[in-house]
């Protein structure tokens, strides 16, 4: 008994769109078909050991509180009411017995079930595309369809597609998803689900974040109120997230909760804002992308709106970030004229990645290196507020930082020489004491000068 051959026979008989179903065999005993309904999955299978058809809701939608699945189960229960059935208490699974020795009859029954399912769920069914198996597929043909809000994408493996693609020569598909405004919001059953983003309403994405997140000026963020708040001047510390984990959880991917304990050592009256870098595959370091040309303006408006909400003067605002978060901090601090502290920021040295692009930064509208080379020509060299960068000569990012310093001498550079720092990745964790000192000095308006620190 060849279950794979039987499965193909079922697909041939069923009058359904083969691009809207994923077919696989479980444990050499179950024929399984998965359907994607926006951001959640429904599976229909036939178990050879249990001789039963099974209908299962694999996960819950994060955006829709009302699922069509319970109604679908009720419909299936009525259509196949003549067979012995069982439904779980949560109404996320239904089975009915179909004991039949003739596989041709099982194929006919299964193909009919697939047709019934496809018709009932048609309005919510989404494409599931294996871009590795079907290498000639034109992904743009699907992404350009205005009715496509969600799409499932996978390779031959079951790994999260953003990770899988960069290791299997499929990065061009990720660039295409980025440039069309599709972000990964789920991964289940070996399929990564991408959702079309409305670049004028990032608030729509809050469903994928916890209740502690907010949206303002198309920026998603958290706020940590001052532990001590008095009538004296109020301060604002805006923290950029650095690139985080590669998985389907948007919080893990776009938000790193930078400086988690800074509130224990910050001066009173300081609101701490932590921004999520929600764009492209792993964020855009606070810069415009080929899809969204408004990110930089959104962030500048965001900071000004925060100042207005909390009653903070510009001179009492400090922007901060480390590594890729430092990229956004330096850029927005310079163009906005804010006090800034950046820890070993990435300024476009792609040699660090060995000539590869694991973070899909080629989807950024202007290459980062080019952006920072042009920046000195478009900002005021007489910086009203201090911009401080810390780095180490052994860091892979140091040459670009030094070049920016030469183009903008008013930028303050704190250079480290410390045996525990041998490369970029060592820097942030070994300089917490300095970071806290510099941030507090900026908040207190204490002047900082270039320094060469040997430890």
Label every model-predicted segment:
Residues 410-455:
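C-terminal catalytic histidine-bearing segment of alpha/beta-hydrolase fold enzymes
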Residues 40-100:
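Intrinsically disordered, low-complexity regulatory segments enriched in Ser/Thr/Pro
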Residues 321-325, 329:
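Gly/Ala-rich beta-loop-alpha elbow adjacent to hydrolase catalytic centers
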Residues 220, 224-267:
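Short, surface-exposed "cap/lid" segments of acyl-processing enzymes
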Residues 312-322:
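Alpha/beta-hydrolase fold nucleophile elbow
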Residues 355-417:
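The feature captures the conserved acid-bearing segment of alpha/beta-hydrolase catalytic domains
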Residues 289-309:
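Alpha/beta-hydrolase active-site loop
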Residues 272-294:
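Cap/lid segment of the alpha/beta-hydrolase catalytic domain
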């Amino acid at each position: 008994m060849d279950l794979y051959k039987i499965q193909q026979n079922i697909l041939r008989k069923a009058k359904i769109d083969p691009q809207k179903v994923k077919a696989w065999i479980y444990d050499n005993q179950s024929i399984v078909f998965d359907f994607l309904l926006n951001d959640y999955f429904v599976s229909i299978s036939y178990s050879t050991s249990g001789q039963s058809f099974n209908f299962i809701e694999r996960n819950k939608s994060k955006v829709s509180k009302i699922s069509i699945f319970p109604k679908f189960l009720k419909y299936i229960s009525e259509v196949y009411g003549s067979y012995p059935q069982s439904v779980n208490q949560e109404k996320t699974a239904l089975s009915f017995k179909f004991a039949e020795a003739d596989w041709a009859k099982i194929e006919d029954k299964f193909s009919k079930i697939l047709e019934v399912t496809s018709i009932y769920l048609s309005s919510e069914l989404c494409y599931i595309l294996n871009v590795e198996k079907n290498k000639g597929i034109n992904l743009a043909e699907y992404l350009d369809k205005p009715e496509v809000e969600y799409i499932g994408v996978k390779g031959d493996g079951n790994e999260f597609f953003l990770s899988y693609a960069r290791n299997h020569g499929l990065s061009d598909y990720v660039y295409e998803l980025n440039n069309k405004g599709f972000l990964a919001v789920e991964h289940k059953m070996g399929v990564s689900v991408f959702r079309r983003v409305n670049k004028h309403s990032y608030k729509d994405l809050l469903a994928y974040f916890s209740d502690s997140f907010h949206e303002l000026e198309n920026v998603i963020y958290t706020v940590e109120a001052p532990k001590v708040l008095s009538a004296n001047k109020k301060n604002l510390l805006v923290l950029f997230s650095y690139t985080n984990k590669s998985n389907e959880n948007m919080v893990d991917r776009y938000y790193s909760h930078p400086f988690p304990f800074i509130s224990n050592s910050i001066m009173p009256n300081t609101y701490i804002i932590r921004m999520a870098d929600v764009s492209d595959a792993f964020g855009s370091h606070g810069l415009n992308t080929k899809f969204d040309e408004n990110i930089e303006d959104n962030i500048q408006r965001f900071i000004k709106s925060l100042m207005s909400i909390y009653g903070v003067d510009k001179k009492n605002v400090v922007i901060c970030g480390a590594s890729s978060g430092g990229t956004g901090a330096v850029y927005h601090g310079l163009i906005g004229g804010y006090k800034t502290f950046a820890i070993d920021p990435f300024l476009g040295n792609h040699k660090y990645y060995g000539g590869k692009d694991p973070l899909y930064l080629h989807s950024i509208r202007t290459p980062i290196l080019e952006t920072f080379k042009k920046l000195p020509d478009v900002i005021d060299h007489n910086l009203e507020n201090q911009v401080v960068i810390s780095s180490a000569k052994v860091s892979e990012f140091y040459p670009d930082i030094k070049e920016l310093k030469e183009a903008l001498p008013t930028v303050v550079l704190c250079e480290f020489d410390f045996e525990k720092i041998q490369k970029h990745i060592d820097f942030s964790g070994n300089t917490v004491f300095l970071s806290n000192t510099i941030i507090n000095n900026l908040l207190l308006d204490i002047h900082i000068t270039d320094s060469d620190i040997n430890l």
